[in-house]
Amino acid sequence: MEEPEEPADSGQSLVPVYIYSPEYVSMCDSLAKIPKRASMVHSLIEAYALHKQMRIVKPKVASMEEMATFHTDAYLQHLQKVSQEGDDDHPDSIEYGLGYDCPATEGIFDYAAAIGGATITAAQCLIDGMCKVAINWSGGWHHAKKDEASGFCYLNDAVLGILRLRRKFERILYVDLDLHHGDGVEDAFSFTSKVMTVSLHKFSPGFFPGTGDVSDVGLGKGRYYSVNVPIQDGIQDEKYYQICESVLKEVYQAFNPKAVVLQLGADTIAGDPMCSFNMTPVGIGKCLKYILQWQLATLILGGGGYNLANTARCWTYLTGVILGKTLSSEIPDHEFFTAYGPDYVLEITPSCRPDRNEPHRIQQILNYIKGNLKHVV
């Protein structure tokens, strides 16, 4: 998408919004599972001078009322309580999903409110017509349920962002390209036809969260408004893009969305400790370009991504895609430069693992989805 060559006043609204403040990044850096990841991502975007081509907007912190548009008061109050005390052994915590993969560490409520607020801020920028694309790379925590934490996610900022967008946009399409099924977002909207959720993810026995088979299609009025594309290990860019484009083409025609929320978790990328898909940022970038050409209000979120350098590579490359910029292969010198060794390049090379996706099974899945979308009115 080239930048508009229009007078500054009308063109300015087409410059993407980038949610950022030093305080926000340092808050996001504190999550134990991804230490300093937010700083690495922002520093690389800055090293390529991409921040200068976007409108930087400082995020607001979500209020209790804003968080309660989705989460229950009881859950939020408990999260606030254990966060103040740093109490990881509270007897009620298990019931709220706190513990093992979502430890109740000190300050976790402030972290959740910061992320939720940042995604709401991005959504509000789209509502206000400030931009067509708003980016919050530290958002995308798609597993949290209304009354429990799950899978490193304490607050479902994606749901909060969608609910905010619903104030203006009648039909919202949520697309989730993280390695894991976007179960929290799907569950939140499984009974409504106003939000369609589409998730491409790894689906195999014992793999978290264990949901998202092609037969999971939503419930009640929301039946056929949940689309799940189960994928096996080893998939690479070309096949992934073919699947993504094929599904999104049908979805767009059937649902006619007015706005898009796009979760771009980088745990699909080769080199991730999840060791499942075999993608590169180029493949995800093609999917992103396909969505951007609809020219709808689009909220961009991050998500998983546990190889920190590769996640920064991926989201910096995707920021370049949003801006229509080709980035130099050589990583510019910056604070985290040494993390990009031994080659110090932006590109990521797929590994030589086999692709476990059989063409006939993929075709079956695509046919099944196409059949379901005939019911969408």
UniProtKB/Swiss-Prot annotation:
Active site: H143
Regulation of its activity: Its activity is inhibited by trichostatin A (TSA), suberoylanilide hydroxamic acid (SAHA), 3-(1-methyl-4-phenylacetyl-1H-2-pyrrolyl)-N-hydroxy-2-propenamide (APHA), 4-dimethylamino-N-(6-hydroxycarbamoyethyl)benzamide-N-hydroxy-7-(4-dimethylaminobenzoyl)aminoheptanamide (MS-344), 5-(4-methyl-benzoylamino)-biphenyl-3,4'-dicarboxylic acid 3-dimethylamide 4'-hydroxyamide (CRA-A) and butyrate.
Effect noted on mutating S39A: Enhances the deacetylase activity
Residues annotated as binding substrate: D101, G151, Y306
Membrane listed as a keyword: no
Gene3D superfamilies in alphabetical order: Histone deacetylase domain
UniProt binding sites for a divalent metal cation: D178, H180, D267
Entry-annotated residues carrying Phosphoserine: S39
Record annotation: effect of changing D101N: Almost complete loss of catalytical activity
Keyword rRNA-binding in annotation: no
GO MF annotation, one: Hsp70 protein binding
Protein name, UniProt field: Histone deacetylase 8
Organism: Homo sapiens (Human)
Lineage: Eukaryota, Metazoa, Chordata, Craniata, Vertebrata
